[in-house]
Amino acid sequence: YFEKFTENNCVGIIYNEVEALSKLTGDYNFTNLCAATSLGLYFGIDFHLIKKAIEEYTPTNMRSQIVKKGDKTLVLDTYNANPSSMKVSLENFNDFIGTKTIIIGDMLELGEESVTEHSQILELAKSLSFDEIITVGPHFKEVNVSGVAFLTTQDLINYLTENEIHSQNILLKASRGIVLEKALEFIK
């Protein structure tokens, strides 16, 4: 009934041979497009109006928000982070074409499982094809002993004022409390 396609790292939906390309990344958002399209069609909305809505929607709430900075594409996903959302984000970002840097911040409120969960996410990140892995926060700093790790977002900002990230694609993913989005303006 619906088919998926991707273009420029964004996911789209095909219905009756008509394509609607969203500004959302990730296969997981295809499910959301299918649900929204199904509801619209159920209530009698013409697919061309649904297509227009899909193509015009721009995420602005730090949830898989795509930000262009010069020749770089940044994925700002700093509204929330937990082990399952971090895993999906990393796996999705791994499929991006071009060079890739991830800046991942702590997943808060994990309690006794924090060290284990941060270690597993770091190991997953290392197993994927990222050119650079940067971590932010005390939990990741504890487990990222041999990599680029910062205790705070301010420490990352201090680093970014002196150093450029050369990747074409950059993912920023963290829990809200890390306020990783503050680093966005310092990425050159």
Predicted features by range, described:
Residues 8, 18-188:
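ATP-dependent carboxylate-amine ligase
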